[in-house]
Structure formats: C-alpha cells, structure tokens
Amino acid sequence: MSSNKNQSDLNIPTNSASLKQKQRQQLGIKSEIGASTSDVYDPQVASYLSAGDSPSQFANTALHHSNSVSYSASAAAAAAELQHRAELQRRQQQLQQQELQHQQEQLQQYRQAQAQAQAQAQAQAQAQREHQQLQHAYQQQQQLHQLGQLSQQLAQPHLSQHEHVRDALTTDEFDTNEDLRSRYIENEIVKTFNSKAELVHFVKNELGPEERCKIVINSSKPKAVYFQCERSGSFRTTVKDATKRQRIAYTKRNKCAYRLVANLYPNEKDQKRKNKPDEPGHNEENSRISEMWVLRMINPQHNHAPDPINKKKRQKTSRTLVEKPINKPHHHHLLQQEQQQQQQQQQQQQQQQQQQQQQQHNANSQAQQQAAQLQQQMQQQLQASGLPTTPNYSELLGQLGQLSQQQSQQQQLHHIPQQRQRTQSQQSQQQPQQTPHGLDQPDAAVIAAIEASAAAAVASQGSPNVTAAAVAALQHTQGNEHDAQQQQDRGGNNGGAIDSNVDPSLDPNVDPNVQAHDHSHGLRNSYGKRSGFL
C-alpha cells in the first residue's frame, strides 16, 4: 500500500485536470492539519504538527526526530494546563452556585418579609374591623338607651286621670321649675266627636283637668275650632265692661304656646247626598248626626309649671281691679317714711338756699353803699380840684367802684392802703406809653392831674384817703390794659389809613376833650410838645 502511495505521489500529472485535482487534495490536507493544529493549545505541539507542511518530507522527518525528546515535556505541560483549566471551571461553578444560593436566600427573605407585612396588615385590618364593630355596637347601645329614656319620658305624661288625682290628693307639692307638657305628642289625634257640643264639653270638663291647665277657645269657625291655654294672653270673654274684665289673673298670662285644633270632616255619603237633595232618605238631622269633629294636638308644650288640682277656685264676684296694693300696711308705712324723709331734705335745702341768698343780698347792699360813698368822695375831690368833668369819668368811677367793692370783700380795709401805696410806687417808676384814646376813655394826662389833685387834697386835709389811692392805681392799670389792646389792633391793621370820620386837626395821641379845651384857650400848637412828655 505504501509503495502504491509513493508511486502515486511520484507520478507527475500531465493534464490540467489532474493538476487541479492534485492541488485540491493538498489544500484539503493543509486545511485539516491547520484545523488540528488550531485545536491544540500548546505552541510547541502546534509547531511540531505544523512542521509536517514543509515541502520537503525529509526535513519533516528530521524535525520529528529532533523534537521527540521534548514531546513528553510538552504533553505534561498540556496536561497541567488542562488540569488548571478544570480547576478554574470548578471554582467558577462553585462561585456561581454560591451566588445562586445567595439570591435564593434573599428571595426567600423578601418573600418572608412580604408575608409578614401582609399578615400585619391583615391583623391591623381585622383589629380595625373589630374596633369599628365595637364602636357600632356601642353606638347602637347608646341609641337604644336614648330611645329607652325618650320612651320613658314620653310614657311619664301618659298617666291616667285617676293617677293624677291620687298624686294631687297625697301631696300638693310639685316642681315649679319644670314646665308643663301634654301627654299627647305633636299632630296626634286626641279624639273624634259627632257634634261640636260634645267637643267643647270634652275639652272643658275632661281634657283640661287631665292636662292640669285651663283650656279656652281662641277662635271658633264653622269648620274649625282653635283651643289654647288660658295663659296664652288673649281669649274671648263674656264680660263686656272693660273695667271689670281687668282682674288679678290677667297678670298670670305669659303667652303660653299650648295649642289644639278641631276640624270638621264631612262623610262621603253626605257629599253625595248634597248632589242629590231630592232623595226620600235625606234630611238635615241625619246629616248633622253623620258629621265628625277630629281634635288634634298642635303644640303640647307649655311655658309654665302646672297648676295644683286641689287649689281653691276664686269666685267671680271676688275679682277686683289691680289698682293699689291690697292688705299691705307695712309697705304703706315704709312709703310714708320715705316721703317724710324726702320732704325734710327738701325743706333743709330750701332753708340753706334762702340763707345763702340773704347773705349775698346783704353783701351786695353793703358793696353798693360803699361804692356810692366812694363815688361821692371822688366827685367831691374832683370838684375841689377845679378840673372839668365829663360823663366818661362817671363811668370810670362806677367801674372803679365795682372793682374796689370786689377787693373789699376779699381783703380787710386796713391792708388795702399798704398794697395800694406799693403799687403806686412801682407804677410811678415805669414810663407810660403813648397810645391814642377814644371818646369813651380818659387821657393819661387827665388821670395824672386827678392823681395830683387827690394827693394835694390829702396833704391839705392831713388824713390818709384810701379811696383816692385806690382810684389812681386802678385807673393806671386799666389804662395799661387798654393801651396793650390798642397796640395789638394797630399791629393787626399794619398802619392802615386814618378813619375819614375823624377830624384831621385832632391829634390822635391826646384826648379829644382836652384838645377842645385847649382849642378854646388858643393852645393848638402845643400838642406835639405835650405828646412827647406823656
């Protein structure tokens, strides 16, 4: 076989087809060798295997013999490498298993935590449901308890008339703070009647004692009758005299809201018979008997305490008008004492007022007498001085007399001369200002002349004159005040024009009376000189 193979290899192809086939075979062998070499990891083994591709067969055999020694070493290295790889794979598998186990443990823990949370939520929801159920049950119990209390409260007024009478006979005491309430509830039908007379009789004689109040008719109509409590404030009465209608019981009416109503409900047969009045069985008596009055409660609540059943009824003849307190002597005595005390106080006040008026009258009369005396003395002094008098001086003396009168009431007469002398000494040191005077005010020169004449008269008589000193001081003070007012008026006018009614020949700084006197003596040009020294 080997010989045949060698022979086939040694055969040289002649044609192109055989050459191509030969190349294809060589290429296939090389590809197989390359694939086998690529599978081996050791480079020495790969180089050894690839050495067979050399073109020379003899070179390949030589290389095979040269590397046979190192083949065992490379095989051992390859085995160690494979073992190392196997160890790495085993470790990698262990790590993967550990990671997978860890993930499974985490997942299990998460599932356990989720299950615990769900259990807690379920427990909380269960607890909430139980709590709500307990609350609902408690509320139902409270509602039942309240309903029981309400039923008891409603059942308490539903007592029979005999029990009311028995309680009233055993004890007459009742709670005055608790308002009366009917045993019938609102809109409840009390009873039905066949006639209006039966209705009124029942309300007056039976329902009133049961309700422990007096029920009266508020208004009566053909198809409705309205009842109310006696204390509601207004109801019909048979007494026509207004003076007799007012009585003590009227003060007890406090607008009670207790109301009843009775309505007339005709039967259906009656309505049909009205349409056919010619029937033989129809008559008015049967229609009256067939009517039905229904008594119904509107407001069962009173605003006052119940009246005792066994109280004494007052006769109608004993009712009197409410005009004055009856049988109250103590109260009348107290009123008389208060009136007497008030009268005494008024009398005392009147006496005090009369005394004060008398004192004032006496003081005024004394002051007027003193003023008259002062005025007479001043007139005598002026006449003795020989100066011309004017009506303005009398007014000035009257004012001075009033001022001296007020000061004489406040101070004693023996202190006045010292004070007046001090004021005169202080005022004499001050220089008087030059101010224009009107027709009603005296000139400062005239006042100075009066003071000088008064001083001369005092010196000639040799006795102190109190009135002269007072007049001089008061005149000087009034002159200063008047000057200040005129200066303010002049400052406000800012030097306005002179009045056209005033004579231009008159000097505004000198008294007109003095100027007229000087004109009569021919002293017209001396005003400017005199005005500078005033």
Curated annotation (Swiss-Prot):
Highest taxon, organism lineage: Eukaryota
Segments crossing the lipid bilayer: none
Biased composition (Low complexity): 402-435
Location of the region described as Disordered in the Swiss-Prot/TrEMBL record: 1-36, 262-285, 353-372, 402-439, 477-534
Name recorded for this polypeptide: Transcription factor RBF1
Repeat is among the record's keywords: no
Function, as annotated: Transcriptional activator that binds to the RPG box and to telomeres. Involved in the regulation of the transition between yeast and filamentous forms and plays a role in virulence. Induces expression of HWP1, a major hyphal cell protein and virulence factor.
Disruption-associated phenotype: Induces filamentous growth and leads to decreased HWP1 expression.
SUPFAM superfamilies on file: beta-sandwich domain of Sec23/24 (SSF81995)
Signal peptide coordinates: none
Conditions for induction: Expression is increased in during infection. Expression is also regulated by CDC28, SKO1, and SSK1.
Subcellular location: Nucleus; Chromosome, Telomere
Any GO BP: filamentous growth
Coiled-coil ranges (or none): 77-147, 332-386
Molecular functions (GO terms): DNA binding; DNA-binding transcription factor activity; telomeric DNA binding
Sequence similarity: Belongs to the RBF1 family.
GO cellular component terms listed in the entry, alphabetical order: chromosome, telomeric region; cytoplasm; nucleus
UniProt keywords, alphabetically: Activator, Chromosome, Coiled coil, DNA-binding, Nucleus, Telomere, Transcription, Transcription regulation, Virulence
Biased composition (Basic and acidic residues): 267-285
